Amino acid sequence: MRKILFLLLLVFSTGIYSKSFTETDKKEVLKQFSELQNALKKKNSNALSTYVSYPLKDGNIKTVIWKNSSDFIKDFKDPENYVFSHLDELRVNSVSGQIDNVEEKLLERGGEGGDKFMEITGKFITSSDDEAEFYYGASGISKNDDLFVVTVSVYDDMFDGSSYYIFILSGNKLKLVSYLQLP
């Protein structure tokens, strides 16, 4: 009887906790991320708003950034509130599943803090990854969901800061679930 209960528990828990991205899911994420990038390039706030999970919270202080798509569209048009800087520069290929990270792109030469550089990375994160606690803690997302995280880092000799865009695939739709900015 104990063996049967153990096996049932094992089968049940595997079903609950095994929601990892398949290769097909990863390609779908990259396809939709590419569509998001096209909407960014065209400054199509209506299309962009469909990729945001509302209410979107700031991962730093857990305050709501946008309650709904109207808030998003209003902020998108205001350059002071623009949070998608450089997100469209990450190169993704949804057919091959390839992500080409941007490494040490020179943004400004000889500024106050020296040369200013940017790096952009995209990666898939599962709850078993070493850095998973940071992303799951910041986003408040269940560890049952795999994440697609895009990081935009800008740095020079005196300052560095990063923005983290945390996405999930929900109902086969890519959704930005948290935005986190560190100095």
Tell where the protein language model's regions lie, with residue ranges.
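C-terminal-biased regions
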Residues: E23-S34, V52-P183
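Short helix-adjacent coil turns
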Residues: E35-A47
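Sec-dependent N-terminal signal peptides
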Residues: I4-S13
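Boundary at the C-terminal end of the N-terminal hydrophobic targeting segment
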Residues: I16-T22
